[in-house]
From Swiss-Prot:
The gene is psbZ. Belongs to the PsbZ family. Gene3D superfamilies: Photosystem II PsbZ, reaction centre. It is found in: Plastid, Chloroplast thylakoid membrane. GO terms for biological process: photosynthesis; photosystem II stabilization. It is a multi-pass membrane protein. PSII is composed of 1 copy each of membrane proteins PsbA, PsbB, PsbC, PsbD, PsbE, PsbF, PsbH, PsbI, PsbJ, PsbK, PsbL, PsbM, PsbT, PsbY, PsbZ, Psb30/Ycf12, at least 3 peripheral proteins of the oxygen-evolving complex and a large number of cofactors. It forms dimeric complexes. Keywords: Chloroplast, Membrane, Photosynthesis, Photosystem II, Plastid, Reaction center, Thylakoid, Transmembrane, Transmembrane helix. One of its GO terms (cellular component) is chloroplast thylakoid membrane. This is Photosystem II reaction center protein Z. May control the interaction of photosystem II (PSII) cores with the light-harvesting antenna, regulates electron flow through the 2 photosystem reaction centers. PSII is a light-driven water plastoquinone oxidoreductase, using light energy to abstract electrons from H(2)O, generating a proton gradient subsequently used for ATP formation. PANTHER family: PHOTOSYSTEM II REACTION CENTER PROTEIN Z. The chain crosses the membrane at residues 8-28, 41-61.
Length: 62
């Protein structure tokens, strides 16, 4: 269970970093928002899923 928690936490950190870097880049490019809106929303959805997954797994690890 600890390994699953660590992998979920690592995925959360990676997705968070990608969103912190990627969203401003998308918004800064001309027509970037119109072309990449679904990608940004997918990343945000994955981020929220990982937040809840890490929270649930944390209750089993501790």
């Amino acid at each position: 269970m600890l390994l699953i928690f660590q992998l979920a936490l690592f995925a959360f950190i990676v997705v968070s970093f990608l969103l912190v870097v990627g969203v401003p880049v998308v918004l800064a490019t001309p027509e970037g928002w119109a072309e990449n809106k679904s990608t940004v929303f997918s990343g945000i959805g994955i981020w929220f899923l990982l937040v809840f997954l890490v929270g649930i797994l944390n209750s089993f690890v501790v």
